[in-house]
Amino acid sequence: MLTGCAGNVTSGTDSQGAQSNVSDGSNNGTAPVPDTDDSRYEIITATEMAEKMGLGISLGNTMEAYEATDCEKMSYEWIPVVGGNEPQDYETCWGADVTTQEIIDGMKAEGFNTVRIPVFWGNMMENDGTYTISKEYLKRVKEIVDYCEKAGVYSVINIHHFDEFIIRRNDLDKCKEIFTHLWTQIAEYFADYPYTLVFEGYNEYLGGDQFDSNGNLKAQSDTNAYKMTNTLNQAFVDAVRGTGGYNAQRVLVISGYWTNIDKTTSSRFEMPEDLVNDRLMVSVHYVDNSMYWANKIGGEEWLKYIDSQCAELKKAFLDNDIPVFMGETTSTYPQENFAKDAEHTDSSECLSIVLGKLTDLGIVPVIWDTNSHFYSRTTYKIVNSSDRKVIREYADKLSAAQQE
């Protein structure tokens, strides 16, 4: 088994020096050999995939949307029904257009080679305690994944917001049981899909607050939060690998503690054990998050902060051959978020600076976008011409690097 911890990654031998049962990346018989010359079915490592994923964009506020009333507190006992309780009622309930092939084709044409599809799997789910995913909701997610396959882009699906709903209400053992069941269903449904489909375990809530016996949200201790994070990440990997098919070798994205860079690069965060070598990436969000909310974008402090966050990721993961998936990256910077003494005062310029620093390290940046904010789902173009120029520049740069 291959075990990895942030800052403490072991090789393919156990503590006594005996050779462990780790695949060298070749087909070891656990994954099927496809009767096709389709390159999408060629086994690919996480390192190789990180080089090919290019720039990514999220299909945000779409398949992860759910009943908006009280959505921030999630205080309801079960998932409210939206409209006629059909997949597209949820898909559009936060204002998104119905996803089409043209929307995904446009993303590809604008320079994105990866589409992250956040999914709230609780939608249309019966409140019977079984956590059985709706077949119709699975089918709709499949349709969008198929759009990505046809467009020639990587697709990434996860458990989004539903992780928060579950973690807030259950102890660790019950969370593990539920997430194992959810990922087993998802992985079995997509077991025959090529390696261009990637699974991302969770969103941002690993290590998050939980309801106490009085119904009040309470923060976990760091010790318990790291235990939860590490346990649920291992449950995700075990569930997917246990379904066989192409999931035996599929690249998986491991979610960080809150996807926070400081917490995820701590030595207390552990990468899961896996049956195959180099099939795991780690996911964090927003390399300049605290600067954004402190209204310090564009200044010297902002630049130094980005560099320090990148240095943490390099030391903990990249230097240990663990690719980094920046699952959410700021798309636009409002003027109110800039520092008073900002040297860089243009949103597109700041986007370019961030993408430059991330891609120079080989980090996969995924732009967080909602309906027609950054990329228009009606014109199939990036909304701002300056942003469009930045994306094209880095898309071309990454494409050229692959040809070298």
Segment roles from a protein language model:
Residues 121-139, 161-177, 207-221, 296-298, ...:
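Surface-exposed, active-site-proximal loop segments in enzymatic domains
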Residues 60-99, 127-133, 171, 291-306, ...:
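Acidic/histidine-rich helix-loop elements
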Residues 176-298, 311-332, 356, 360-363:
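Active-site region of glycoside hydrolase catalytic domains
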